Amino acid sequence: MDPDLENVIRQALTDAKAAGKDYLSQTKEAVRTVRQVRPDMTASAALTAVNLVRRR
């Protein structure tokens, strides 16, 4: 995975958690962020990327 994309995902998850969002809302926020910076990615691919980052 592109290290820059991984950093974007980690930051989105951190920001969502700091805002008091639950696990699902954190994930949704990260997927939205990925789709904003990588509009070529489908929602499914963005979700897969978020899940991969969470597992690391």
Regions found by a protein language model. Give the residues of each.
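C-terminal alpha-helical interaction appendages
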Residues: 1-56
